[in-house]
Regions:
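Active-site loop ensemble at the mouth of alpha/beta enzyme cores that anchors a bound cofactor
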Residues: 274-278
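Short secondary-structure boundary segments
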Residues: 218, 241, 263-264
């Protein structure tokens, strides 16, 4: 996944408006308009870097003359004490953009780091690590980019990407079989269908319907192993629910194709980065 400038500019502008409003009473009253400084991004954590270009864009939207020397790129490992980048430009722009740039890059690096840890935990199995739509409102494009930087895969970006019958849809509509048949009649032929199942009986119904992806929701590892055997490659199997660092390896070893985690985006720990002025 590649970030496009038009995708991130609106996010950054909204964040800057939220933080600066119409004046930075500290910076605007202390710093001369023509004052130039260099700001160093320094890591205080260990993991996978993500969001350095986003941080640069924050400063450039405040001062289009800001330049950057990047020493560590998105997707590369970073450790405590590493100098990640140096930004040079008007001091006012660097100070005003500091918190927004750090908030975004720290969060994105946290997502990438958490994803990478999960990827490493399932190495040697066929399972891929995927995100969900449990993203923070307004930040989905940045979070999903960070997941790919960490070595994970993107699930649906939005509701138009794939038809996904969850328990709430089936509770509201009724029969899984009827729902799948109606969807096939009404939607485009290129759209895939994923169905959420909670037991092996529902799995068999989904397989009989020929859906492309089946989500195994909160199933035991024993039942997931049986589900893999029953499916025998006829559909992609996605494990979801109660996935933790302690359980993810056992889940992967059942033979599922995908393990999806909402925790990669909805509650990730921010990566610690500081900015030093000179």
């Amino acid at each position: 996944m590649k970030l496009m400038q038009f995708q991130i500019d609106d996010i950054i502008k909204s964040a800057l408006l939220e933080d600066i409003n119409y004046v930075d009473v500290t910076t605007d009253y202390l710093i001369d308009e023509d004052d130039i400084s260099t700001a160093k991004y320094v890591s205080k954590d260990e993991g996978i870097l993500c969001g350095i270009e986003v941080a640069l864009r924050v400063f450039q939207l405040l001062d289009d003359g800001v330049t950057c020397r990047i020493f560590i790129n998105d997707g590369e490992a970073v450790k405590k004490g590493d100098i990640i980048a140096e930004f040079t430009g008007h001091t006012k722009a660097l100070l005003k953009g500091e918190r927004t740039a750090l908030n975004l890059s720290q969060h994105m690096s946290g997502v990438a780091t958490a994803t990478n840890r999960c990827v490493k935990l399932v190495e040697g199995t066929k399972a891929s690590i995927a995100d969900t739509r449990k993203t923070l409102p307004g930040l989905r494009v940045l979070q999903k980019y960070a997941v790919t930087v960490g070595g994970g895969r993107n699930h649906r970006y939005n509701l138009s990407d794939c038809a996904m019958l969850k328990d709430t849809h089936l509770d509201a509509y009724g029969s899984m079989t009827n729902a799948v048949n109606v969807l096939r009649e009404r939607m485009g032929h290129t759209v895939k269908i994923e169905v959420e199942v909670g037991n092996l009986e529902e799995l068999q119904e989904a397989l009989d319907l020929g859906v492309e992806v089946i989500m195994l929701d909160n199933m035991s590892c024993e039942d997931m192993t049986k589900a893999v055997e029953i499916t025998a490659g006829r559909a992609k199997l996605e494990a979801s629910g109660n996935v933790t660092a302690e359980t993810i390896r056992k889940i992967a070893e059942t033979g599922v194709d995908i393990i999806s985690l909402g925790a990669l985006t909805h509650s990730v720990k921010a990566f610690d980065i500081s900015m030093k002025m000179s």
